[in-house]
UniProtKB/Swiss-Prot annotation:
Keywords: Chaperone, Host cytoplasm, Host nucleus, Host-virus interaction, Inhibition of host innate immune response by virus, Inhibition of host interferon signaling pathway by virus, Inhibition of host STAT1 by virus, Inhibition of host STAT2 by virus, Interferon antiviral system evasion, Phosphoprotein, Viral immunoevasion, Viral RNA replication, Virion
Gene: P
CDD domains: RABV_P-protein-C_like
Motif (Nuclear export signal): 49-58
GO annotations of cellular component type: host cell cytoplasm; host cell nucleus; virion component
Protein's job: Non catalytic polymerase cofactor and regulatory protein that plays a role in viral transcription and replication. Stabilizes the RNA polymerase L to the N-RNA template and binds the soluble protein N, preventing it from encapsidating non-genomic RNA. Also inhibits host IFN-alpha and IFN-beta signaling by binding and retaining phosphorylated STAT1 in the cytoplasm or by inhibiting the DNA binding of STAT1 in the nucleus.
Name by which UniProt lists this protein: Phosphoprotein
InterPro entries xref list: PP_M1-like, PP_M1_C, RABV_P-like_C
Lineage, uppermost ranks: Viruses, Riboviria, Orthornavirae, Negarnaviricota, Haploviricotina
Subunit structure: Homotrimer when phosphorylated. This trimer is stabilized by binding to the L protein. Binds soluble protein N, and ribonucleocapsid. Interacts with host STAT1, STAT2 and PML.
Biased composition annotated in UniProt, kind: Polar residues: 146-161
Similarity section: Belongs to the lyssavirus protein P family.
Organism: Khujand virus
Length: 297
C-alpha cells in the first residue's frame, strides 16, 4: 500500500477554518434571536386593554376625507406659489432668448465678428426687456436693503451728504492724477448712465475692435495698438470710456466717438506695456485734441 503523507500545518489550517465557521454560525443565530426578541414575549390580549381603549373606533372613511382635504390644501398652496405657463412672463422671454442664441450661432457661422453680433444682440435684448417689462411708475426703484437709516439721520442729512461729496471729489481728483494722463482736462462732467448709451459705446468699440491706431512712443517713433491687445473685457472698456469727458454726450446724440482717445485712456490705465512704450505727454495731447475735435462737430 502506498502511504499518503499529510502536512500537519494543513491539518491545523483546516481546523482553524472549521472553528471560524462555527463561530460565524453562532453569531448569525444570536443576531436572528436578537432581532426576533419582540416575538418571543407573551402576546397582548385585547381583553387586558383599559376601558378607554375599547371606546376608540377607527373610521377609514374619515381618514380618507382627512387625507383628501390635506392633499387639496397642498395643491392649493402649490397653485398659489406657481403660475401657469400662460401667465408667467418669463416663458416667452426664454423662448425669445433661445431664438436670439440661434441667430447668433447662424451669424457666427457666416463669418461675422463676434463683438459686432453681440452688440446687436444686446441692443435687441435691452429693447425687448424695456418693452415687455416696464418699470412701475408709482413705485420707487431704490434698493430697500439700503433704506435702514434712522429717523434722526433722515431729519438732518445735510452735513453728512456735504462731507461725502467733498470726499468723493477729493478721491476723484486723486485717482485722476494717479492714473490718467497729466495734461488731460477733466473739467467736463458726464451725464447720467443710460443703458442705450452704454450699448452705443459698446457697439462702436466692437466695430473697431481690431482696427489699428497709432500712438507716439517714448523714442518719438510711432507704434500701433488696438483694443484686442488690451485683453480686457468689453464691459470694462465701456465702463472706463464713460469716465472720459464728452463721451456720454456723443453717445447720447448717436455721433461717432473718439475711439483713439478711448483706447489711449483705457490702455494707459490697464496695460503696463502700453505705459512703458507710450509718451504720456504726447498721448494726453492727442487725447485732448481728439475730444475737442469730436465735440466741435
Amino acid at each position: 500500500m502506498s502511504k499518503i503523507f499529510v502536512n500537519p500545518s494543513a491539518i491545523r489550517a483546516g481546523l482553524a477554518d472549521l472553528e471560524m465557521a462555527e463561530e460565524t454560525v453562532d453569531l448569525i443565530n444570536r443576531n436572528v434571536e436578537d432581532n426576533q426578541a419582540h416575538l418571543q414575549g407573551e402576546p397582548i390580549e385585547v381583553e387586558a386593554l383599559p376601558e378607554d381603549m375599547r371606546r376608540l373606533h377607527i373610521s377609514e372613511q374619515k381618514h380618507s376625507q382627512l387625507s383628501d382635504s390635506a392633499c387639496g390644501k397642498e395643491e392649493g398652496s402649490d397653485d398659489d406659489f406657481y403660475m401657469a405657463d400662460s401667465e408667467d412672463p418669463y416663458v416667452p422671454m426664454q423662448s425669445y432668448l433661445d431664438n436670439v442664441g440661434i441667430q447668433i450661432v447662424k451669424k457666427m457661422k457666416t463669418g461675422e465678428r463676434f463683438f459686432k453680433i453681440w452688440s446687436q444682440a444686446v441692443e435687441e435684448i435691452i429693447s425687448y426687456v424695456t418693452v415687455n417689462f416696464p418699470l412701475p411708475s408709482g413705485k420707487s426703484t431704490d434698493d430697500k436693503s439700503t433704506q435702514t437709516v434712522s429717523e434722526r439721520s433722515r431729519q438732518n442729512p445735510q452735513p453728512s451728504s456735504v462731507k461725502k461729496e467733498d470726499q468723493l471729489s477729493k478721491t476723484k481728483v486723486v485717482s485722476q492724477e494717479a492714473s490718467g494722463p497729466p495734461a488731460l482736462e477733466w473739467s467736463a462732467t458726464n451725464d447720467e448712465d443710460d443703458a442705450s448709451v452704454e450699448a452705443e459705446i459698446a457697439h462702436q468699440i466692437a466695430e473697431s475692435f481690431s482696427k489699428k491706431y497709432k500712438f507716439p512712443s517714448r523714442s518719438s517713433g510711432i507704434f500701433l495698438y488696438n483694443f484686442e491687445q488690451l485683453k480686457t473685457n468689453l464691459d470694462d472698456i465701456v465702463r472706463e470710456a464713460k469716465r472720459i469727458p464728452g463721451v456720454m454726450r456723443l453717445a447720447q446724440d448717436g455721433l461717432r466717438l473718439p475711439l483713439r482717445c478711448i483706447l489711449g485712456w483705457v490702455a494707459s490705465t490697464h496695460s503696463k506695456r502700453f505705459q512703458i512704450l507710450v509718451d504720456s505727454d504726447k498721448l494726453s495731447k492727442i487725447m485732448q485734441d481728439d475730444i475737442n475735435r469730436y465735440l466741435a462737430y
